[in-house]
Protein backbone atom coordinates (compact mmCIF):
# COMPACT_ATOMS: atom_id res chain seq x y z
CA UNK A 1 0.00 0.00 0.00
CA UNK A 2 1.34 3.42 -0.95
CA UNK A 3 0.28 6.67 0.64
CA UNK A 4 -0.93 9.28 -1.84
CA UNK A 5 -0.23 12.64 -0.23
CA UNK A 6 -2.61 15.50 -0.99
CA UNK A 7 -5.31 13.48 -2.72
CA UNK A 8 -8.15 15.78 -3.77
CA UNK A 9 -6.25 19.05 -3.23
CA UNK A 10 -4.17 20.00 -6.28
CA UNK A 11 -1.91 22.41 -4.41
CA UNK A 12 -0.91 19.63 -1.98
CA UNK A 13 -0.50 17.05 -4.74
CA UNK A 14 2.06 19.34 -6.41
CA UNK A 15 3.98 19.87 -3.16
CA UNK A 16 3.17 17.08 -0.69
CA UNK A 17 6.02 17.85 1.72
CA UNK A 18 4.79 21.43 2.17
CA UNK A 19 1.51 20.12 3.57
CA UNK A 20 2.94 17.29 5.67
CA UNK A 21 2.77 19.43 8.81
CA UNK A 22 0.93 22.50 7.62
CA UNK A 23 0.54 25.72 9.53
CA UNK A 24 -2.14 28.28 8.58
CA UNK A 25 -2.34 28.88 4.82
CA UNK A 26 -4.51 30.36 2.09
CA UNK A 27 -6.68 27.50 0.82
CA UNK A 28 -6.90 28.98 -2.70
CA UNK A 29 -3.15 29.39 -3.29
CA UNK A 30 -1.62 27.09 -0.68
CA UNK A 31 0.74 29.88 0.39
CA UNK A 32 1.52 30.09 4.07
CA UNK A 33 0.06 32.89 6.14
CA UNK A 34 2.60 35.60 6.97
CA UNK A 35 4.09 35.45 10.44
CA UNK A 36 2.89 38.03 12.92
CA UNK A 37 5.29 40.93 13.51
CA UNK A 38 7.85 40.07 16.15
CA UNK A 39 7.50 36.32 15.63
CA UNK A 40 10.89 34.68 16.19
CA UNK A 41 12.35 32.63 13.34
CA UNK A 42 11.47 28.95 13.17
CA UNK A 43 14.01 26.60 14.71
CA UNK A 44 14.42 24.69 11.44
CA UNK A 45 15.17 27.93 9.56
CA UNK A 46 17.85 28.91 12.08
CA UNK A 47 19.30 25.40 11.83
CA UNK A 48 19.28 25.41 8.04
CA UNK A 49 20.80 28.88 7.67
CA UNK A 50 23.49 28.15 10.26
CA UNK A 51 24.40 24.84 8.65
CA UNK A 52 24.53 26.49 5.23
CA UNK A 53 26.90 29.17 6.52
CA UNK A 54 29.20 26.54 8.03
CA UNK A 55 28.99 24.26 4.97
CA UNK A 56 30.00 27.12 2.67
CA UNK A 57 33.16 27.47 4.75
CA UNK A 58 33.91 23.72 4.90
CA UNK A 59 33.06 21.33 2.05
CA UNK A 60 33.36 18.39 4.47
CA UNK A 61 30.23 19.52 6.34
CA UNK A 62 27.22 17.62 5.02
CA UNK A 63 23.56 17.40 5.96
CA UNK A 64 21.69 14.10 6.15
CA UNK A 65 17.95 13.67 6.62
CA UNK A 66 15.45 10.82 6.49
CA UNK A 67 12.75 12.21 4.19
CA UNK A 68 12.25 15.46 6.14
CA UNK A 69 14.35 18.19 4.46
CA UNK A 70 11.88 21.04 5.01
CA UNK A 71 10.89 19.99 8.52
CA UNK A 72 14.52 19.92 9.63
CA UNK A 73 15.70 22.99 7.71
CA UNK A 74 18.03 20.96 5.51
CA UNK A 75 16.09 22.09 2.43
CA UNK A 76 18.05 25.35 2.77
CA UNK A 77 21.31 23.40 2.39
CA UNK A 78 19.81 21.25 -0.37
CA UNK A 79 18.87 24.31 -2.44
CA UNK A 80 22.24 26.05 -2.08
CA UNK A 81 24.74 23.17 -1.88
CA UNK A 82 23.07 20.02 -3.23
CA UNK A 83 26.33 18.05 -3.26
CA UNK A 84 26.56 18.47 0.52
CA UNK A 85 23.01 17.25 1.16
CA UNK A 86 21.70 13.69 1.41
CA UNK A 87 18.10 12.51 1.83
CA UNK A 88 18.08 8.78 2.50
CA UNK A 89 14.30 8.45 2.47
CA UNK A 90 12.30 6.96 5.31
CA UNK A 91 15.28 5.08 6.72
CA UNK A 92 16.46 6.67 9.96
CA UNK A 93 18.69 3.72 10.78
CA UNK A 94 20.45 4.17 7.45
CA UNK A 95 20.82 7.93 8.02
CA UNK A 96 22.61 7.32 11.33
CA UNK A 97 24.92 4.64 9.91
CA UNK A 98 25.56 6.72 6.78
CA UNK A 99 26.55 9.66 8.99
CA UNK A 100 28.88 7.41 11.01
CA UNK A 101 30.50 6.11 7.84
CA UNK A 102 30.99 9.60 6.48
CA UNK A 103 32.50 10.72 9.79
CA UNK A 104 35.06 7.89 9.64
CA UNK A 105 35.98 9.15 6.16
CA UNK A 106 36.74 12.68 7.32
CA UNK A 107 33.38 14.35 6.76
CA UNK A 108 31.47 16.30 9.39
CA UNK A 109 27.88 15.07 9.04
CA UNK A 110 24.88 16.72 10.62
CA UNK A 111 22.15 14.09 10.80
CA UNK A 112 18.78 15.81 11.30
CA UNK A 113 16.05 13.42 12.42
CA UNK A 114 12.86 14.01 14.39
CA UNK A 115 13.41 12.45 17.81
CA UNK A 116 10.19 10.45 17.60
CA UNK A 117 11.61 8.56 14.61
CA UNK A 118 14.89 7.64 16.29
CA UNK A 119 13.20 4.54 17.68
CA UNK A 120 13.66 3.16 14.15
CA UNK A 121 17.37 3.99 14.05
What are these regions (language model features)?
Residues 1-121:
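Thiamine diphosphate
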